[in-house]
Swiss-Prot record:
Glycans are attached at N116, N174. Residues 79-90 have a biased composition (Pro residues). Coiled coil: none annotated. It is found in: Membrane. PANTHER family: CHOLINE TRANSPORTER-LIKE (SLC FAMILY 44) (PTHR12385), PROTEIN PNS1 (PTHR12385:SF4). It comes from Dictyostelium discoideum. Residues 19-63 have a biased composition (Low complexity). Keywords: Glycoprotein, Membrane, Transmembrane, Transmembrane helix. Residues 1-17 have a biased composition (Polar residues). This is CTL-like protein DDB_G0274487. One of its GO terms (biological process) is transmembrane transport.
């Protein structure tokens, strides 16, 4: 990522920019009669110990240095790749205190630079050298705004009409008192339990990530085998066969790839440590929950009103549009959170550490600002693609519900194809949005970078993603089961055990899965940064780089 000097020099000369300050005084600080240079290639040779690239004392560029080249990364000036030997290996990696000192917070291990040395590419220098970030894919931001305007028009026209169906507003009056007592009992318990569960899970992930990943996979195997036995006993042979195949592939994947668990565990521990250092990223997740909650209320009101006042083809067309809008807004909110988290992790990766340029003030807010301004068009673009696929799946579901057998079969085929396509696109988009957050590029350019990464690291990406995804999914599943059981028990005095279990499951799942999604985004962001820019980690946090490379060798 640094600037390379393409000028040719004799092999006897010192590396460019690494001569001691006594050899050349900075230009403009000599008497007029002394401002001259020796002929090209005839510099006076002095024996010296070669310094690390990027740590010249009081070095200023000469006229023969090429001008700075434009770079994509717009968050801060990244240090130049180190031209040095690898740091010495770390001993006693199994000690908890050594490991925590490496992966915790804004540290990263290593020897701090000498105070007399000047860091090339400091944070303030990057602010003046690089141009302001450019707005990417702005037309999709405009299209997203126009879609909201159309939603307002459709909703206003629906509420202006008289409903065809009469609803008795007093139907549920006799249950209102019991419902309030039921809610006051369920909500505090669910929120407190969810927060305690998240605290325990993060503690376990920070200190015993490898064991957490292994036991999560054992839980997934047991769950699939349990479903298989249940459906065979129940008589649903086909479902039993499906779950047996799923159990077989999970076991095969674990046996084949279990040697990669230490690397994923290192990434997971590192991600949790960074989240603890910057807890505002968790608050960003709660903000996304609130926005989604408000959006579902607004959308649900519009959807219900449309189905009260319209019938026939008009009702069908408006419903399809509303479903598309539901998916688009939901994915925009979700991907904005992911991009915010990835931006924070990228800032930590490139700027923190003893040899780094230093973290900016409130990096989470800065990352959120970029996601909502310069990168918002790219987020809308990528979210639009997956929303169109999900809308087509909704249409295929309508075909499945058709009475015509041929249409029903075609609907099943389309639904299967679109389901697989949706999973692939969502997987791809997750890493594309990570590139958007790291480099600030457009969605198309980020997609090209993601393709390039997949060409070289697709196997490692899938393995790492599966380990992290399975760990988070099992964590969310265990919490959901506990919440549903406890919620049902608490609701027995109100004769609402079913509703209590369902409500506790819904609210608790939202709180828990939001925190776990932040952990997921953090882990894969560290993975992308490492496989794309390993030399930066070796320069800014050499001992953490040694820890990464000891568990995963980039080939």
């Amino acid at each position: 990522m640094g600037i390379e000097d393409n000028s040719q020099q004799p092999n006897t000369g010192s590396p460019y920019g690494q001569s001691p300050p006594s050899q050349y005084n900075p230009y403009g600080q000599q008497p007029p009669q002394q401002q001259q240079y020796n002929p090209y290639g005839e510099q006076q040779q002095q024996p010296q110990q070669q310094q690390q690239y990027g740590y010249q004392p009081q070095f200023q560029p000469t006229y023969q240095q090429p001008p700075p080249q434009p770079q994509y990364y717009s968050q801060a000036q990244m240090p130049f790749p180190p031209q040095q030997q690898q740091p010495p290996p770390i001993t006693n990696l199994n000690k908890a205190n050594d490991r925590e000192s490496l992966i915790g917070g804004v540290g990263g291990g290593g020897i701090p630079p000498n105070n007399n040395q000047t860091m090339v590419g400091s944070y303030n220098e990057g602010e003046t050298k690089f141009a302001p970030p450019k707005y990417q894919d702005i037309w999709f931001s405009i299209l997203f705004g126009l879609n909201f305007g159309l939603l307002i028009v459709v909703s206003a026209s629906a509420f202006a009409k008289t409903p065809y169906t009469y609803y008795d507003s007093n139907y549920y009056d006799n249950t209102s008192g019991g419902s309030f007592g039921f809610l006051f009992a369920i909500l505090p318990f669910t929120i407190v339990f969810s927060l305690l569960y998240i605290w325990a899970w993060l503690k376990l992930a920070a200190n015993h990530a490898e064991s957490l990943i292994k036991y999560s996979f054992f839980g997934a195997m047991g769950l699939m085998i349990g479903y298989c036995v249940f459906f065979f006993v129940w008589g649903a042979i086909y479902l039993g066969i499906i779950f047996a195949i799923m159990a077989f592939f999970i076991i095969l994947f674990y046996i084949s790839c279990r040697s990669r668990i230490p690397f994923t565990a290192t990434l997971l521990s590192n991600a949790v440590a960074i989240i603890k250092e910057y807890p505002s990223v968790i608050r960003a997740g709660y903000v996304s929950i609130f926005i989604n909650f408000v959006w579902f209320i607004v959308w649900g009101s519009a959807f219900a009103r449309v189905n009260m006042v319209y019938t026939g083809a008009i009702q069908t067309c408006i419903n399809i549009y509303l479903v598309f809008t539901l998916y688009w807004v939901f994915h925009v909110i979700k991907n904005t959170l992911h991009t915010t988290v990835s931006g924070l992790l990228a800032t930590w990766y490139f700027c923190s550490g003893p040899n780094g340029v230093g973290m900016p003030h409130n990096p989470t807010l800065g990352s959120a600002r970029r996601a909502l301004t310069t990168s918002f068009g790219s987020i809308c673009f990528g979210s639009l693609i997956i929303s169109l696929i999900e809308t087509l799946r909704y249409l295929s579901q309508m075909m499945i519900n058709n009475r015509n057998v041929v249409v029903k079969i075609i609907g099943y085929i389309f639904n299967c194809i679109l389901s697989m396509l949706s999973s692939i696109v969502q997987f791809f988009n997750t890493y594309a949005f990570t590139h958007v957050a790291i480099y600030g590029k457009s969605f198309c350019d980020s997609a090209k970078s993601t393709f390039t990464m997949f060409e070289n690291r697709l196997g490692s990406t899938i393995i790492n993603d599966n380990f992290v995804g399975t760990t988070i999914a099992i964590g969310g599943l265990v919490a959901s089961l506990l919440l549903s059981i406890l919620g049902a028990l608490i609701s027995i005095p109100f004769d609402m055990s079913v509703y209590g279990g369902a409500l506790a499951l819904f609210i608790g799942y939202l709180v828990i899965i939001t925190n776990l999604e932040v952990v997921y985004s953090s882990t894969i962001s560290l993975f992308v940064c490492y496989v794309m820019e390993p030399e930066v980690l070796a320069h800014t946090k050499p001992q953490l780089y040694q820890l990464y490379s000891s568990t995963y060798h980039l080939r």
